[in-house]
């Protein structure tokens, strides 16, 4: 009997062990898990909320540093927080700023669009120094000349005017252009690159006897680098020796007007017997480093009324000399960029 009782107890225990949970037990489990998840996740979400508040406070504090009004800062914050992870980039990075401007214009609120010019001026993005590439058609200077291509016809043109929404291009030749047509504008930015962009004509009107087309601004702007390396403007005294094919050497002095790791521009008063392909030796000092007998080749020359300028390609630049020039240009870029952001240029 005892054995039978023990067996019955074992069977009953097994049934209890393998039976499904009751509704009450399931509910209790859900409550316990929910409480556990809440306890674990609450600090995480709280920290995220505090982080968002901190980012927003820092953003508006930085906006006040640039004298933005509360309305201007609020409009900027509204769009920049959906554009980049670090909203403060809009105060430093012009490409980010132009993306935000695009979003404001696309939204089409006239009251917000009116604020862009004031914000742009306060952030010192109204114009670009020559060494910073264009990132939007808004960066193109008024009176910039170029070529407009419409229906495979090339027409000389220039930027007549611009605002935050539109670019106005005046045509220098008579040609019929209609709203809705696709056009391309090509232009050369001095000491920088060749640029082009495509657009759809929004409006056409006549001003002063010329046809003016209106296109929307775009950040889809193509850039073709003019040179392999950055060429930096300088004003340094230079002595040079021209090595003529007949063995004659011509010594002269002038001014180094720009330099890169690939070459330089040298200008001097008057004229000399020079032709493209002539070899030249340069002596000058850059960043406390003296370049002695730096060999180059004259690749082009421009003769003005009272002076001559030579484009020179370096032939035998040592690693040390290349490092000195490269470091000089990098430091000058940083200094000029800082001065630009501080409103000094």
Swiss-Prot record:
The chain crosses the membrane at residues 24-46. The keyword Lipid biosynthesis does not apply. Residues 225-330 form the PilZ domain. SUPFAM superfamilies: PilZ domain-like. Gene3D superfamilies: predicted glycosyltransferase like domains. Coiled coil: none annotated. It is a single-pass membrane protein. Pfam families: PilZ (PF07238). It is found in: Membrane. GO terms for molecular function: cyclic-di-GMP binding. InterPro entries: PilZ_domain (IPR009875). GO terms for cellular component: membrane. Keywords: Membrane, Transmembrane, Transmembrane helix. This is Uncharacterized protein aq_1917.
């Amino acid at each position: 009997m005892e054995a039978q009782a023990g067996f019955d107890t074992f069977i009953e225990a097994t049934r209890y062990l393998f039976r499904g949970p009751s509704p009450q037990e399931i509910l209790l489990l859900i409550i316990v898990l929910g409480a556990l998840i809440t306890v674990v996740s609450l600090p995480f979400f709280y920290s995220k909320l505090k982080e968002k508040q901190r980012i927003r406070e820092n953003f508006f504090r930085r906006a006040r540093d640039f004298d933005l009004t509360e309305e201007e800062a609020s409009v900027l914050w509204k769009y920049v927080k959906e554009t980049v992870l670090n909203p403060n980039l809009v105060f430093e990075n012009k490409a980010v700023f132009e993306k935000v401007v695009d979003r404001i214009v696309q939204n089409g609120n006239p009251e917000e669009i009116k604020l862009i010019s004031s914000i742009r001026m306060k952030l010192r993005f109204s114009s670009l120094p020559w060494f910073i590439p264009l990132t939007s058609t808004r960066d193109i200077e008024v009176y910039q000349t170029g070529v407009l291509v419409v229906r495979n016809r090339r027409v000389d043109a220039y930027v007549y005017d611009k605002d935050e929404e539109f670019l106005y291009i005046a045509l220098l030749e008579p040609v019929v252009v209609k709203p809705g047509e696709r056009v391309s504008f090509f232009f050369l930015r001095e000491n920088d690159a060749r640029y082009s962009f495509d657009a759809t004509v929004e409006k056409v009107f006549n001003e002063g006897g010329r046809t003016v087309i209106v296109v929307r601004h775009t950040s889809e702007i193509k850039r073709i680098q003019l040179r392999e390396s950055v060429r930096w403007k300088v004003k340094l005294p230079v002595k040079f020796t021209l090595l003529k094919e007949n063995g004659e050497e011509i010594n002269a002095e002038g001014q180094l007007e720009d330099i890169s790791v690939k070459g330089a521009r040298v200008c001097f008063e008057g004229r000399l017997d020079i032709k493209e392909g002539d070899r030249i030796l340069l002596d000058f000092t850059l960043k406390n480093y003296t370049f002695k007998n730096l060999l180059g080749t004259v690749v082009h020359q421009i003769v003005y009324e009272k002076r001559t300028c030579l484009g020179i390609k370096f032939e035998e630049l040592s690693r040390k000399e290349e490092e000195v020039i490269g470091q000089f240009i990098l430091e000058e870029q940083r200094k000029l960029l800082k001065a630009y952001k501080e409103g000094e240029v």
